[in-house]
């Protein structure tokens, strides 16, 4: 889920609704045919994402404390990522794939200090921490 939110934040222009909870089985062939508390929550979340910070919302069958916390973490992550520049995405993408700052600098044709500046401006460390937090809190909300 966090990976999908990250990819859609990078693309921009999307409203993202995340539903937590159970789904009816067997799973439907098409999402429109699916049902269960998670699907109903996701549909509500997509509507709630309209005008929400980061254009994202997390909802559950009962929007209790765990769901509200997961929502807050995902909103913070999407808001941070939505402010990231193309240069920031480029630098974080290389480092996320395991390149060192020096190797990323070589790939980008810039200095290592310029890579460091891009990573700071992109909130790379904050984004990684927010993604980990969102993952944990979404897991808690889905229990």
Could you tell me what each predicted segment is?
Residues 1-143:
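Regulatory and interdomain segments flanking nucleotide-handling catalytic cores
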């Amino acid at each position: 889920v966090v990976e999908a939110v990250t990819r859609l934040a990078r693309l921009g222009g999307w409203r993202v609704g995340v539903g937590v909870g159970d789904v009816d089985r067997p799973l439907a062939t098409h999402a429109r045919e699916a049902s269960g508390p998670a699907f109903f929550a996701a549909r509500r979340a997509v509507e709630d994402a309209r005008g929400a910070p980061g254009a994202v919302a997390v909802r559950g069958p009962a929007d209790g404390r765990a769901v509200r916390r997961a929502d807050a973490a995902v909103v913070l992550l999407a808001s941070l990522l939505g402010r990231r520049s193309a240069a920031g995405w480029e630098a974080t993408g290389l480092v996320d794939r395991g390149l060192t700052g020096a190797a990323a600098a070589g790939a980008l044709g810039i200095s290592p200090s310029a890579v460091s500046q891009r990573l700071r401006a992109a909130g790379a460390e904050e984004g990684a921490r927010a993604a980990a937090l969102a993952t944990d809190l979404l897991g808690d909300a889905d229990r």
